[in-house]
């Protein structure tokens, strides 16, 4: 009698992914942490400004220095014109991009894919008039490069700030963020059933007033953590 037994792969998906490059924070020094997509193990994203001919590497920990060849596929959905330059991921066309890295277990290995999307940051919820069906989220305006700030439209009403990065077709709450002590705090796998104030605490809740705006500095800091304020 043969008894079939299932043996799960011993390999596990990474808990972190970082990017490091010629234009990310301090060049070739800052390892920028990517954010986990809520409920999607092995799925990470980050927003970066990449000027013409910028290059970067990546890793599941700082100083790992993985490159172009370590992706099974690269899907450029943003017109970046991506190539391999000495192992680096090189972008010919400068601009703001969302980098989406997905890891998938394949036997005893992990296949990684990289997708480029046009960067989008948006405001939703009370500050944008509520979650009424048919009310579109309000896009933030990107600066010319990462020396400037992303700026939202004026909030139309007051309430708790709800904002997010649009990553492919993922729902907004999977890629949501707030501000914690002036720094961008990504939701990742935080369990938020109602709102930040109720489920995480008042320090995670940003009160938005009508006429105010959200200002974000993205991809410029040495520690790779973005900053923001409402005023």
Model-derived regions: residue spans:
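Insoluble glucan recognition modules
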Residues: 1-231
């Amino acid at each position: 009698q043969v008894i079939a037994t299932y043996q799960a792969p011993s390999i596990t998906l990474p808990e972190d992914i970082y990017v490091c490059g010629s234009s990310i924070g301090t060049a070739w020094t800052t390892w920028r942490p990517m954010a986990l997509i809520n409920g999607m193990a092995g799925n990470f994203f980050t927003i970066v400004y990449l000027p013409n001919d910028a290059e970067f590497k990546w890793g599941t920990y700082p100083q790992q220095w993985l490159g172009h060849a370590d992706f099974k596929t690269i899907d450029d959905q943003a017109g970046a014109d991506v190539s391999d330059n000495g192992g680096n991921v090189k972008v010919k066309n400068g601009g703001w991009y969302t980098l989406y890295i997905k890891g998938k277990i394949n036997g005893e290995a992990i296949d990684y894919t990289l997708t480029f999307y046009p960067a989008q940051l948006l405001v939703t919820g009370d500050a944008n008039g509520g979650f009424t069906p048919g009310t579109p989220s309000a896009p933030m305006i990107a600066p010319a490069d990462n020396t400037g700030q992303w700026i939202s439209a004026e909030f139309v009403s007051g309430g708790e700030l709800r904002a997010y990065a649009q990553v492919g077709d993922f729902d907004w709450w999977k890629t949501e963020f707030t501000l914690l002590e002036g720094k961008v705090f990504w939701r990742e796998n935080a369990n938020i059933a109602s709102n930040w104030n109720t489920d995480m605490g008042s320090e995670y809740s940003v009160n938005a007033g009508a006429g105010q705006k959200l200002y974000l500095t993205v991809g410029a800091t040495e520690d790779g953590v973005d900053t923001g304020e409402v005023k």
